[in-house]
């Protein structure tokens, strides 16, 4: 007789080693366009309320282009990205109570913060955070044009509690002398990019082989973290796993 065989796809992952870091970093990210975080009302010259962008713009839109001219009361066309699709929408600015033209949109074009560099690989690439950079108002992953890593001094650490994550507060000096590298990607798994010589000097520990998520077990483990000025290993306990 004939025995049927089921075909199964197999993905082979090459052995890879990464240098663990655990040092704090300052992060600056410029958005790919101007992020719309909301719309709002304002008063016209006659005191009545208006909101030109209401029902036109949505939180999470990225404005890519405007007319490129001085804003007047004439209709303007905004080129924006929404859910991966480019759109052209018209808005007519209104004069506010001070005589300035507005469209009634709250926008943001950058994000800053502090985090932890997770690893450096043999090609000088880094991975950091372990989660993406999301906008604080929309909670959406930010579309990034470019970004920069900086040195930072941690001035305060708040311990996490159940339902509330811990927090690091740091001081960042945004100057060329303090740059550690450039950020090329912002994803749900973290931020990634390239290290300069100063950042490579942070990778002084021996490389470790990467592990697959299926290899993670409940029980004692260690994390590498900077709490008092230098990166050290700390004992932890893994009490639950969510692999999906």
Residue ranges with predicted function:
Residues 2-15, 73-105:
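PDZ-domain C-terminal substructure recognizer with occasional recognition of PDZ-binding tails
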Residues 2-6, 13-37:
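N-terminal, Lys/Arg-enriched amphipathic/low-complexity engagement segments
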Residues 15-22, 69-72, 103, 206-210:
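N-terminal post-signal-peptidase region of extra-cytosolic proteins
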Residues 26-58:
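PDZ/PDZ-like groove recognition
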Residues 44-50, 64-66, 103-104, 209:
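Second-shell loop/turn segments in exported
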Residues 53-72:
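Conserved PDZ fold ligand-binding element
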Residues 63-65, 77-79, 222:
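Hydrophobic beta-strand signal
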Residues 82-83, 92-244:
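Serine endopeptidase catalytic core focused on the charge-relay Asp
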